[in-house]
Structures are given as structure tokens and as C-alpha cells.
A protein has these predicted regions:
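Hydrophobic faces of well-ordered beta-strands that scaffold small-molecule active sites
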Residues: 107-111, 131-135, 166-170, 212-214, ...
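Intrinsically disordered, low-complexity Ser/Thr-rich linker and spacer segments
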Residues: 42-56, 65, 86, 93-116, ...
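Active-site groove signature of glycoside hydrolases
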Residues: 195-226, 274-288
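Glycan-recognition patch characteristic of GH18 chitinases/ENGases
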Residues: 100-196
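Substrate-binding surface in catalytic domains of secreted glycosidases
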Residues: 143-150, 224-225, 229, 233-345
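Primarily a LysM-type cell-wall glycan-binding module
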Residues: 1-20, 41-43, 47-71
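Catalytic domains of carbohydrate-active enzymes, especially glycoside hydrolases
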Residues: 116-141, 199-212, 384-396
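Glycan-binding loop/region signatures in secreted carbohydrate-active enzymes
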Residues: 172-178, 182-183, 320-384, 414-421
């Protein structure tokens, strides 16, 4: 695997010759619209090298044992880590191990039903890269009844045909926004909780879902225990069906906080089959220009989360979108990562890379107004997958599958094994 960051004077022809990869392959894998490129653009160049694994040294580790574990020669590990003393490995030290044993994870992609042809086309193209399909098409009434917002039958049917397990995503959405009042009213009332549990189980079974994915956001902190009661009741009723729960990111438990206070990570993890921590929107819509998922913050979230959630149950979220912000108003437009990349090319804006957050960004002007764009590229995605490997997490989630992210999917296909079970 190679990543080429474009410099002044580079051309696709020059890069193609350098790596021995056809220009059209580079264009396709990176989603380019022409042969024009700009400084700072990161290009993913596929090759036949072994995938790199990321490993944290533990007590008792020695090079020859690691070589056996990862099916590689000791000299390969030593060559991949210049500067380390193979006879004095430090506990907690991170090393790179080229290995034929790929990282194996369970992936989940969120999809909002739109046109059947577009949804099915997306599923067809990503069939081998998804374990679960989370269908975002359900909300709840004031009385707790879950209901369908749009037709999802074709998506569910196609996902089964492609060996992707469909999950019913239910949200506390009212009038287009997440409603704390709505979910609070339902969770606090035993009858409404019962309505919600029964309707979710019935819908999941009737519509042939393999389980339910809960996405209740801004639950009032006072309803923390009610949420646990609901999840326990729901899991009991679901039986062998999957209970997947999405949780807001945090680095400490603050029970009174209006955004994260209602979510008792440890208690939820004891009930749910899979827990997805939404490691996104550090840089949020309407806020100042910031990376959406800075790697240093993501690692802090993971480290806290693993004190509460077993690593075998935990997924982290990878954004497939960027934010285009007008400065200084911070008016924000969400755009797919591919659109963000190609907008930099079309405006001629050199792409910068922040080494602390491990995220790309650029600045451009339109109609006299300054725009700052943060997004993800192959470099930031690689860093995120390193965290999954380093902390031995269950896998990843992606918001949202309609956002093209060819670099991410190409890397996943070439370097990672997606578990189908």
C-alpha cells in the first residue's frame, strides 16, 4: 500500500510511471474527475505489499513470538520499525508489522432510503465491505409506537441477497430534528416503553431485519436509568435478534451533561450485543472550523470507552463526509469526502494536513467569502483503522453510505477482512 502526496510539479503521468500503476486506475480508486491534480492531494496507490498491522507491545512479547503470531519473519518486523531495539521492546510501544493476516472487523453502514435504484447500486458496489446495513427509516410517536418513515423493503431484500445483515435503525426524530422531549416522555413511562419494545420487535420480524440499532440522541440526563430499563426490556424481547446501540462520544462520565449524561456506557454494554461509539462531529455544524474526527481525540474517546465497554463489542464511527464552513459566521455545509476532495481540485486550493489531528483541510474564497473545509482522506482513514487494530476493536460504522468515499472502500477491500456472520 502506498500513499502519494502530490507536490508542485507532479503529474498523474509522472506518478503512474513512478509506481507502475495505470493512470486510469489511479483516477478510479481516488475518484478523480480529470487528470488535473493539486499540491497536498493524497492519492491511494494500490500495490502487492503485505498489509501493515499496528500492534502495542505487551509484557512477555519478543520479536520471534510476534513473527510467529503474525506469520512473518523476524527480520521483516525489524526492518519495518527502524530505531527499535529488538532485544528491548518497551511495554506500551506501538510497532508496525507487515503481515498476511489482515485485520478482521465487523462493519456497519448507515443508509437513508432514497431512490431504490441508487440505494441498490450502492449496496451492490459495497457488498463485500459490509457486515451490517443500518436502515435509517424509523422514528417513534409520543405514545412510544415505532413507525416507518419511508419504504425500505427493496433495500432489506437486497441486503439479504448480498449477505449483509440489515438492522432497523430507530431514532427520536420529530419535525426533522432529534427530540429530547419526545424520547424522554417515552422512556419515563412503562406503558410507552412497552409499546416501543413491542412495536420494534414486531417491525423487525415482519420486515425481515436481523436486529435493531438504537440511535436515541439528546436523551435527558434524568432518564439515564429509564434508558437502561428500556434496553433491557428490548433485548429480552428481541431474543436472538441483534441489539445494536449507538452512543455519543465522551472521555469521562458526566451524568448531568445534557448531551452525554444519559448514557451509562458500562450498563449499556452489559445489555447490547454491539455498541457503536459515535466518534464524529468533534468539529460540528455551526461550530468553528475543526476536524470532524481528529485522531488524538478519537484515541482519548477509545481509551475511556474501553474502561466501560469490552473491546469485542465496541465499534467506532468513521465519517464519510466533510464540513465546508464560511468564516467567520461558521455557516456549515456538509459534503461527501469525495466532493470535498474534488472541490479543492476545482478551486485550485492546496490541501493542508494537520499532523496532530491527522486530518486534511483547505481554504478557498467564493464570492468574496472565505471558506474552510475539513474532511477525510486516505491518510486519515488509515490512522483510524490503526486505532481499530491497536485496541482490537470489533469494527467500524460509516455515516452515510450515499456519500462517495472511494479511497476508504478501496483501502478496506485491499487491507482488511470484513467478517460476515
Amino acid at each position: 500500500m502506498a500513499v502519494h502526496v502530490v507536490r508542485f510539479g507532479d503529474t498523474l503521468w509522472k506518478i503512474s510511471s513512478m509506481y507502475g500503476v495505470p493512470i486510469q486506475t489511479i483516477i478510479a480508486i481516488n475518484g478523480l474527475t480529470s487528470t488535473f491534480i493539486i499540491p497536498g492531494l493524497a492519492l491511494y496507490i494500490p500495490d502487492n505489499m503485505l498489509p501493515n498491522r499496528t500492534y502495542k507491545i505487551k509484557s512477555g512479547d519478543v520479536i520471534w513470538k510476534l513473527a510467529q503470531q503474525f506469520h512473518i519473519g523476524p527480520s521483516t518486523i525489524i526492518q519495518a520499525n527502524p530505531g527499535i531495539d529488538p532485544n528491548r521492546l518497551r511495554i506500551g510501544q506501538n510497532i508496525t508489522i507487515p503481515s498476511p493476516l489482515k485485520l478482521a472487523i465487523r462493519t456497519l453502514g448507515f443508509m437513508m432510503p432514497s431512490t431504490i435504484s441508487a440505494n441498490v447500486s450502492t449496496l451492490n458496489s459495497l457488498a463485500n465491505e459490509l457486515t451490517y446495513l443500518a436502515v435509517v427509516a424509523y422514528s417513534i410517536t409520543n405514545e412510544g409506537w415505532a413507525f416507518n418513515l419511508m419504504d425500505d423493503s427493496a433495500i432489506v431484500s437486497r441486503s439479504w441477497q448480498l449477505n449483509i445483515k440489515p438492522l432497523l435503525v430507530v431514532q427520536n426524530v420529530a419535525h426533522g430534528d432529534f427530540s429530547a422531549e419526545l424520547v424522554g416522555q417515552v422512556l419515563e413511562n412503562p406503558t410507552r416503553r412497552k409499546n416501543l419494545t413491542e412495536s420494534l420487535v414486531n417491525l423487525a420480524r415482519q420486515r425481515r431485519f436481523s436486529g435493531v440499532s438504537i440511535d436515541f440522541e439528546f436523551i435527558p440526563p434524568a432518564k439515564r436509568q429509564d434508558f437502561i430499563l428500556f434496553l433491557r426490556e428490548l433485548k429480552t424481547a428481541l431474543g436472538s435478534l441483534i441489539l445494536h446501540v449507538n452512543l455519543p462520544s465522551k472521555t469521562a462520565d458526566i451524568p448531568t451533561n445534557r448531551i452525554i449524561g444519559a448514557y451509562d456506557y458500562a450498563a449499556i454494554a452489559r445489555i447490547a450485543d454491539i455498541v457503536a461509539v459515535m466518534t464524529m462531529d468533534y468539529g460540528y455544524a455551526g461550530g468553528p472550523p475543526d476536524p470532524i474526527s481528529p485522531i488524538n481525540w478519537m484515541e482519548q474517546v477509545i481509551q475511556y470507552s474501553l474502561t466501560q465497554i469490552p473491546h469485542t463489542k465496541m465499534q467506532i464511527a468513521l465519517p464519510l463526509y466533510g464540513h465546508d464552513k464560511i468564516v467567520p459566521s461558521n455557516r456549515t455545509t456538509m459534503l461527501p469526502v469525495l466532493a470535498a476532495q474534488n472541490q479543492a481540485i476545482s478551486t485550485g486550493a492546496p490541501i493542508q494536513f494537520n499532523n496532530i489531528s491527522k486530518a486534511p483541510w483547505y481554504r478557498y474564497w467564493h464570492e468574496g467569502m472565505e471558506h474552510v473545509v475539513w474532511f477525510e482522506d486516505i491518510r486519515s482513514y488509515i490512522e483510524m483503522y490503526k486505532l481499530v487494530d491497536l485496541y482490537q476493536l470489533a469494527g467500524t460504522t460509516y455515516w452515510e453510505l450515499s456519500f462517495p468515499a472511494p479511497q476508504n472502500w478501496a483501502y478496506l477491500k485491499n487491507n482488511i477482512t470484513v467478517v460476515k456472520r
